[in-house]
Design a protein with these regions (language model features):
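Boundary/activation segment at the start of structured domains
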Residues: 31, 74-77, 91
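Short active-site-proximal "capping" loops at secondary-structure junctions
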Residues: 68-72, 98-99
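N-terminal glycine-/serine-/threonine-rich phosphate-binding loop
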Residues: 1-63, 81
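Ligand-binding beta-strand-loop-alpha-helix segment within the catalytic cores
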Residues: 4, 8-27, 85-163
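Short glycine-rich phosphate-binding loop at a beta-alpha junction
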Residues: 60-66, 160-161
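Generic structural signal for well-ordered alpha-helical scaffold segments
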Residues: 44-55, 77, 81, 119-123, ...
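Glycine-rich beta-strand-to-loop/alpha-helix junction loops that act as flexible
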Residues: 65-70, 164-166
Length: 167
């Protein structure tokens, strides 16, 4: 099954943290890290390594990314720029966005406008010659949801990075 039954979710919530690594019921790889800083470095490194490997194979990379946590953006941009990893074949599907009470996008300068935040912190620090093309940045809004769904369905997603709400 592709979803987690609510009763199974509650079972997972009862597993003590020190028993998660290597748990026999895991369906995805799991690692415990020391703190958010280490998680940010790990997220950045894994994504850069994936893009570089797929570039070397001549294959595009498709990822779903959250807006937060913000701790992985600096390591991401530093690694992409230092290694000269081209993001020309990277498609990025943004998993979230904040809307106003009417379901409309927040103003561009609103502190909770995720697109503005991502443009500044995820894309903004990347050298222009390495950048993700605008057409391969899929922003999730009510008006774009169907197009994003269709684009995701076109080919497998290579990596989905999860966020956590500490920011």
């Amino acid at each position: 099954s592709d979803h987690v039954d609510p009763s199974r979710l509650l079972e997972w919530c009862r597993v003590p943290a020190d028993q998660l690594v290597g748990h026999p019921g895991l369906r995805v790889p799991f690692r415990m890290v020391e703190d958010a800083r280490e998680m940010g470095r790990l997220m950045a490194q894994e994504l850069v390594d994936l893009v570089a490997a797929r570039n070397a194979e001549g294959r595009p990379t498709r990822v779903i990314v959250p807006c937060g946590p913000s701790g992985w953006y600096a390591p991401w941009t530093e690694r992409v720029n230092a290694r000269g990893v081209s993001l020309a074949r990277l498609s990025v599907f943004h998993m979230d966005e904040c809307l106003d009470w009417q379901g409309l996008p927040l103003p561009k300068e609103h502190p909770y406008n995720f697109r503005t935040f991502m443009e500044r912190h995820f894309y903004g620090g990347i050298r222009p010659d390495l950048a993700v093309p605008e057409a391969q940045r899929f922003w999730l809004l009510p008006a774009t949801m169907e197009r994003v769904r269709e684009a995701i369905a076109e080919a497998p997603v290579d990596l989905t990075l999860g966020g956590w709400g500490q920011d």
